[in-house]
Amino acid sequence: MELVEEHITPVSPYNFGLALGYLRTSSSAILEHISGDRYLRAIRVGDHPVVVDITFSGPIDQTTLHVKVAGERLNDDTIRTVLTWVCRVFSLEVNPAPFHALYKRDPVFGILINNYRNVRPILIADPYEAMLWTILGQQVHTRVARRMKWSLVRLCGHPLEYDGKELWLLPTPRDIANMDPSDIERIGISKQKANTIVRVSYLVSTGTLDFKELGGLEPESVYQALTRIKGIGPWTAECVMMRGLGFDDVIPAGDVGLQHIVGRFYGLGRKATESELRQIAEKWRPWRGWAAFLWWFQLQTEAYVQQIASGEKE
């Protein structure tokens, strides 16, 4: 296995340690391996598996990410693809100053901006993965969703070993498209979700659903294209647009967790309705997706603190 090391300097300020903290508690971080201040992830570049191994050094205003790429027959195109992927997933090249300025419009949200000032949205590795995880997360607790995601990976994913650790590659769209939905049901996934996963995987494997093409369209067009697929509703579409395609100004306002925390922070005495959440979120334009990320980070932090206090383990 060949190994190449490169370095990335994010737009400052940036706290990669805080980003790793998010991933440690995220129900969407299934294939990521976080150990101390080190990030490991196996991905595919074309048909070739590679391992992305990231550490960091320096203060938040001068952070450097040290990116090792491990794989067979590495070339310049592969390395460039991986570095672009890292910058995209961690939003490293986006100037956060306009987002931080939202505190002037909304002092309540400004509390979160201050708490998580030096981290930016972390995307799910690719839109297809975001679609799978979001479908499995429909109307279930995050712990249940996490177990289902792991079960799917172990059913039809691909393990590889790196530095003494077992990493897993996401199943390809073709892997899942060729499965009988009943096989997916046997690992504890509902019939409806199993059918949707196979359906979406078939559309992606045949090129009928092209996420690269969707990424270049206007948000409303993407939303309409996704919600035309059976089993994909508004919440799923907006989560995929935000977490998978990286639309900065899309917020999944139907998310119950967001509704609860916004209702609490804004003194409603109850969870916000979807309409109320969208109205409050008008103050966060054109960064509503970034705002949703911080609210989710706050929810994860609160849940983690509660879990530690009660002595629970994942």
Segments the model singles out, each with a brief description of its role:
Residues 1-314:
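HhH-family (HhH-GPD) DNA N-glycosylase catalytic core used in base-excision repair
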